[in-house]
Every structure is written in C-alpha cells, then in structure tokens.
Amino acid sequence: MINNLIESIGIALHNEFGDDYKIYPEKVEQGLKEPCFFISCLNPTMELFLGRRYFRTFQFCVQYIPAKRGKEKSECNNVTERLYRCLEWITAREDGLPIRGTQMRAEFFNGVLNFFINYDCFVTKTSDEVPMMEELAYKLKG
C-alpha cells in the first residue's frame, strides 16, 4: 500500500506541476534535475482497531528542491500553497477510492522545502482459508 500511495502522490504532483518538475520516488545521488520533488514514507504505523480491522497511518515527506535563482524562499512559499491544494485529496491506486491528507505542514530548511502529510485509513485483514477436515474418527470409552 505504501508504494501505491507514493505513486498516487506522484500522479497528483505531476497533475499540478506538469513535466517541468521532476518527481523522484527514491533519492538520487547524481544527475539531479531541479526543480524536483522527492517522495518518502517516514513512519507507517498499524494498530488493531476491532476484530480484523486495523487503523493504518502513513506519514509522508515530500521534499521540494527549487531551481537556483536567488528566490528559493519565495518559490517554496508558492509551492507550499499548491501542495496544500493538490495533496489534500488523492486517489489511491489500489482501490481507486479517494483518501484525504491530514496534518499537513511545511518546513523550509537549508534551501529545501519539506512538506509533511499523513494519509490514514482502515484496512481489514483477510483470514487465510484453512481447508476443512473431511472425516473425524473418534472412540468413546464406556
């Protein structure tokens, strides 16, 4: 599910920013084309809710590296506003249902915008089907 959410975030970013902004789902050591985005899942959690239902929380960090033009802070402020809008609702690739982003916040540090967002949902674990016994033999004493 994490990879599906990363893909869905990437699609939302591409729809908002277009082909001029490169989107990387993994860190790139060399050949980085700015401006660009990095998408990473930080702290996924899963807690038992009831029965076979679990509540899962996925915290993502979308890092934006602006083009070096001398106005990085202003550019990051504009990108932050667009991220609030385009990542509030994404379509999960797994089931096609919309999922809402919560706890959105942005930090600008060392020339990089870090945009944090949570996507939370309930999941139901399917039980593994165990074949039934065909026959049962028993002896009664007495």
Language-model regions, residue ranges each:
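Short acidic low-complexity segments
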Residues: 24-33
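A short, hydrophobic beta-strand-centered structural micro-motif
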Residues: 33-42
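Charged, amphipathic alpha-helical segments and their flanking helix caps
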Residues: 1-24, 44-142
